[in-house]
């Protein structure tokens, strides 16, 4: 679980991420689709899954907006993400492993954007937060 320090660390770095969240979301999603090409299967209905394409940009923004909402609900991620978990489990049928893959790609992009601010301590807190988020999204798969 997230300690008070973890929550403070996430909120601190999120304040820096937020102004660039559209770019970060698009780059993290683009990176995931290139490095883990099996994830493209979930987006076959898009006109293009190429990095920088309009659907990738749009979904990157959607993802980051949802994560932004989660930053404000760190004390109840499971409750907060119930409907989104149901959607991914029952309608979209996304393999929950992909939530961790996206989390990894987000960390890579955040580290590239904020090399000085993304200290090992911040990295640990962000990783714990994103893993909790991934776990909450996977809740309805059980």
From Swiss-Prot:
O2 binds at residue 59. GO terms for biological process: hydrogen peroxide catabolic process. The keyword Metal-binding applies. Pfam families: Globin (PF00042). Keywords: Acetylation, Heme, Iron, Metal-binding, Oxygen transport, Transport. Residues 1-142 form the Globin domain. Disulfide bonds: none annotated. One of its GO terms (cellular component) is blood microparticle. Heme b binds at residue 88. Signal peptide: none annotated. Red blood cells. The modification N-acetylserine is found at residue 1. InterPro entries: Globin, Globin-like_sf, Globin/Proto, Hemoglobin_a-typ, Hemoglobin_oxygen_transport. GO terms for molecular function: haptoglobin binding; heme binding; metal ion binding; organic acid binding; oxygen binding; oxygen carrier activity; peroxidase activity. Gene3D superfamilies: Globins. The keyword tRNA processing does not apply. SUPFAM superfamilies: Globin-like. Heterotetramer of two alpha chains and two beta chains. Belongs to the globin family. Involved in oxygen transport from gills to the various peripheral tissues. This is Hemoglobin subunit alpha-4. The gene is hba4.
């Amino acid at each position: 679980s997230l300690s008070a320090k973890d929550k403070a660390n996430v909120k601190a770095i999120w304040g820096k991420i937020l102004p660039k969240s559209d770019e970060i979301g698009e780059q993290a999603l683009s990176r995931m689709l290139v490095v883990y090409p099996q994830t493209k299967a979930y987006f076959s209905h898009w006109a293009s899954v190429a990095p920088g394409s309009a659907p990738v940009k749009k979904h990157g923004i959607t993802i980051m907006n949802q994560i932004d909402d989660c930053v404000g609900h760190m004390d109840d991620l499971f409750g907060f993400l119930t409907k989104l978990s149901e959607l991914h489990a029952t309608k979209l049928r996304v393999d929950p492993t992909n939530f961790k893959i996206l989390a990894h790609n987000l960390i890579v992009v955040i580290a590239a954007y904020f090399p000085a601010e993304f200290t090992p301590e911040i990295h640990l807190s962000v990783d714990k937060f994103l893993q909790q988020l991934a776990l909450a999204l996977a809740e309805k798969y059980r």
